[in-house]
Design a protein with these regions (language model features):
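Conserved acetyl-CoA pyrophosphate-binding loop and the N-cap/start of the following alpha-helix
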Residues: 55, 59-68
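Short beta->alpha transition motifs characteristic of CBS
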Residues: 36-39, 84, 107
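Acetyl-CoA-dependent GNAT
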Residues: 1-56, 71, 124-128, 132-139
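C-terminal "cap" of GNAT-fold acetyltransferases
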Residues: 79, 86-90, 106-139
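Conserved active-site alpha-helix within GNAT-family acetyltransferase domains
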Residues: 62, 87-105
Length: 139
């Protein structure tokens, strides 16, 4: 979370982007996570998430990601949400697969002037809505 909040972090990066939505999660009045949906072209947005390090592994990432997808595909009306995730983050990759994201490729970026390897994943609105319908009928 710290890297996303610093002066040149994600919040600053997306501060002036048109059609950008930010969602936050607080516990006891403290920010513990936030997500961003930043429009990349009509009907599509990039997803980013940041969690406080002491809150990982507790299901918070899944909750806030699910709520963000619901807003993005529902209220906002997006048709595609895409993301990049570090290749060395297996828990996040598993979460995105469980939520219906599909692997589309790989990319490399410099993060803090060091090379980092990422997976590119996306989720289409139709696939998201179909998976929600299946989940509801299984209940």
């Amino acid at each position: 979370l710290d890297y996303a909040l610093r002066q040149d972090g994600w919040l600053a990066e997306f501060q002036d982007w048109p059609n950008t939505w930010r969602f936050s999660a607080e516990q006891s009045g403290e920010l513990v996570a936030f997500t961003i949906l930043a429009t990349t072209k009509v009907g599509e947005a990039e997803f980013r998430i940041a969690l406080r390090s002491d809150k990982t592994g507790q299901g918070l990432g899944q909750i806030i990601t699910s709520q963000t997808l619901e807003k993005g595909f529902g209220e906002i009306g997006l048709t595609r949400i895409h993301l990049i995730v570090r290749k060395n983050n297996p828990r996040a990759i598993q979460l995105y697969h469980r939520l219906g994201f599909t692997l589309r490729g790989e990319c490399h970026k410099d993060v803090n002037q060091k090379p980092a390897h990422f997976l590119i994943m996306d989720l289409q609105q139709d696939d998201y809505l179909a998976s929600r319908t299946i989940a509801k009928t299984r209940r």
